[in-house]
Amino acid sequence: AVEYTRKQNGEKRMKHYNGLVQLEVNRLADQYEVEYVKRQVEQLPQTFAAFCGSSGRSVKIWVRFARTDGSLPTATQEVLLFHAHAYRLAVTCYQPMLPFGITLKEPDLMQSCRMTVDEQPYYNPSSAPFCIEQPLTLPDEETFRQRKQNSESAPERMTPGCESMQIFAQMY
């Protein structure tokens, strides 16, 4: 989502933010499921690209975002806030369309993926961006990482709602 340059002293500086958010649907069973996910996300005009991941069992979805005036943020802090809100909106809009879960990740400007093995990727260079206001703060709801780490006990995180004794009794 971001292009960086290096100053003479080696320090990175943000050069350009493109407004793209990457969603991932992982652990698909076969090529039929991959193609199904691609066909579903093609229905939204905000889908810039959708393609099979290098494993052959995932789909990467690129979604366009812009501010309500059509611009993109340029200041680093504004970009971080914008991208976090854009990621959450993308998950909220795309998840109901799919019978498979979107892999939740921390919104990251440096998120990347390997070269695709997809012979027929979906690509729409004229996709319409989702338009959102420039946020001033991070989203209020818990992040995926916070939800996963709420419990102190690893067994309770593996099977929420069950007591540790029940979990161990089932395991042994």
Regions picked out by a protein language model, each given a short descriptive name:
Residues 1-57, 65-84, 145-148, 163-167:
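Signature for HUH/AEP ssDNA processing cores
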Residues 1-4, 92, 117, 170-171:
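Short, hydrophobic/amphipathic alpha-helical patches that form generic packing surfaces
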Residues 20-22, 62, 112-114:
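Conserved hydrophobic/aromatic beta-strand scaffold that supports enzyme active sites
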Residues 52-59, 107-112:
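Short Gly/Ser/Thr- and Asp/Glu-enriched loop/turn motifs at secondary-structure junctions
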Residues 75, 97-150:
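Catalytic "initiation/cleavage/transfer" segments centered on a nucleophilic residue
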Residues 86-101:
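Conserved short secondary-structure elements within globular domains
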Residues 150-172:
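C-terminal accessory/binding modules appended to enzymatic or scaffolding proteins
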